[in-house]
A protein has these predicted regions:
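Short, compositionally biased
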Residues: 2-156, 223-237
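Hydrophobic core segments of beta-strands in well-ordered, beta-rich domains
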Residues: 99, 162-163
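C-terminal, surface-exposed recognition/capping segments
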Residues: 3-6, 17, 39, 158-159, ...
């Protein structure tokens, strides 16, 4: 059996590949892997490397500042050395941490208590073209512009913010794996519902994204329409 791939295999993938070659079939390879690893084996935790060589994927972010690359094979019987506080996503140079729960216990809420300013200085924050909105990757900056009028039910911890439309799309295309990690971490899955983004369309409205079908819309009045909010933070690697 020979597998050709142009992508370098990780250590775990190389081990599984060699095990499959040795056993000759997937069923026996899975049994051998279970025997070797054992049900009580703890997934390896590694301090986030500073070299930028961190593998792309979904990570379990721990309270002690470490992160574990999440494997879909993990079960509730896999133990962790410390509490999981967020889910990390790395895609090339892009990284983001996703909170374990929606704000306001998952209720649909308004984004703000009133409209934002419409002064010349505010205009730099408003994006009315789809292509530009999708390219918006600065949710932290956007949230700072909203912070003084933000709904009080949105209780953002330090350095946490509401994702921009561009950041949300990167989360959306990885939703299946992120939700598996959220379930493992005893968090709440991202729902097939509308979520607020921090990308403002105008003084009165902001862009929203449906996690059910990826559709986005911009005529949503920030102070009256109600949608879900999920906070994020920078994932430094």
């Amino acid at each position: 059996m020979e597998i050709q791939t142009s992508k370098a295999l990780s250590d775990v993938q190389q081990f599984r590949y060699e095990l499959l070659q040795w056993c000759g079939n997937v069923e026996d390879a899975e049994k051998a892997n279970t025997f070797v690893m054992g049900n009580d084996e703890k997934p390896v935790q590694a301090q986030l490397p500073k070299s930028g060589n961190m593998e792309d994927g979904i990570y379990l972010v721990h309270a002690d500042g470490k992160a574990t690359l999440f494997e879909l094979e993990y079960t509730k019987d896999d133990n962790m050395d410390s509490e999981i506080v967020a889910i990390g996503l790395k895609m090339g140079g892009f990284g983001i941490k996703i909170a374990l729960h929606d704000e306001a216990n998952g209720d649909g809420i308004t984004l703000t208590t009133k409209s934002n300013g419409d002064l010349k200085a505010d205009q730099d924050y408003y994006i009315d073209k789809y292509d530009d909105a999708v390219a918006d990757m600065d949710g932290a900056r956007n949230t700072n512009h909203l912070r003084s009028i933000l709904n009080k039910q949105i209780k953002l911890a330090d350095d946490w913010y509401i994702p921009s439309l561009g950041e949300w799309y990167r989360i959306f295309i990885n939703k299946k794996a992120i939700n598996a990690a959220l379930e493992f971490a005893k968090g709440d899955k991202l729902q097939d519902r509308w979520y607020w983004t921090s990308t403002e369309y105008s003084a009165t409205s902001a862009w929203i994204l449906s996690l059910g079908d990826g559709y986005t819309y911009h005529w949503s009045t920030k102070a009256s329409y109600t949608y879900r909010v999920r906070a994020v933070s920078a994932f430094i690697f």
